[in-house]
Amino acid sequence: MKVRTSVRKLCRNCKIVKRNRVIRVLCSVDAKHKQRQG
């Protein structure tokens, strides 16, 4: 998982999820697209 100051969708399968005031990007196709804002 990448920790970045700004997260964005990297492909059309990526989803933006808010959990406990943390913005995350999850991808069902490519696990390398996982990101967390921090």
From Swiss-Prot:
Alphabetical list of Pfam families matching this protein: Ribosomal_L36
Q: Which GO terms describe its biological process?
A: translation
The reply to whether Secreted figures as a keyword in the UniProt entry is no
Q: List GO terms (cellular component aspect).
A: cytoplasm; ribonucleoprotein complex; ribosome
Q: Does the keyword Ribosomal protein apply?
A: yes
Return the InterPro entries for the record.
Ribosomal_bL36, Ribosomal_bL36_sp
Q: Name one GO molecular function term.
A: structural constituent of ribosome
Q: Which family does it belong to?
A: Belongs to the bacterial ribosomal protein bL36 family.
Protein's recorded name: Large ribosomal subunit protein bL36
